[in-house]
Amino acid sequence: MNRDIAQSELQGFSRTLAELEWLLLVLVLLYFVLPSSTVVDQWGMLLAMAVYAAFVISFRYSNLFTRETQWKLALETWAIIFFISWCVYQTGGIDSPLINLYLLVIIFSALTLGKMVTLLEFTLISAAYFYLAQSSVEEDSFSLLHLGEMTMTFAPYLLVGYLTSLLAADLKNAREGLELLSDTDELTGLKNRRAFN
């Protein structure tokens, strides 16, 4: 029964991630068609959107992966990180209005994939962010002061990831406590019939 509940939860997370993937693509497409948007390589951006859409369609709707797993969700979020990084790189680096899309991945990962995967994804996002920040300055002007400014700008991402991970862990512990309480007899502490179904 617990496996069915876990699979049902993963299916719900997967549906949410599918909506997130399509909304992300629509948002990037809307930014792309805005007359005031700044895109360095328009063909590269169009190609990235087409490849990302093909990935989502093939990964989600080809029925190759019928059973939902956390690693499937993690792989999809890594693809989202690469897509966001490419879009941010093409639209102004760390000054891009699309930079905050990383928060969606951090929050989703923290709520659904656990602390370790969230830490790995946050490390990947951090590397992308600092690469984008470093590539936006001249070689001789990069200094400790500039590194401090980048770190302070990026600190809210760390806080969001950390606090969301803590909240998700607390919710998971509370749910497990409620399951244990509902599966045991209040007076004797032994498992009741519901625990064996």
Short names for language-model regions:
Residues S58-S62, M152-S182:
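Juxtamembrane or sensor-core-proximal signal-transducing alpha helices
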Residues E179-N197:
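Conserved nucleotide-binding and Mg2+-coordinating catalytic segments in signaling enzymes
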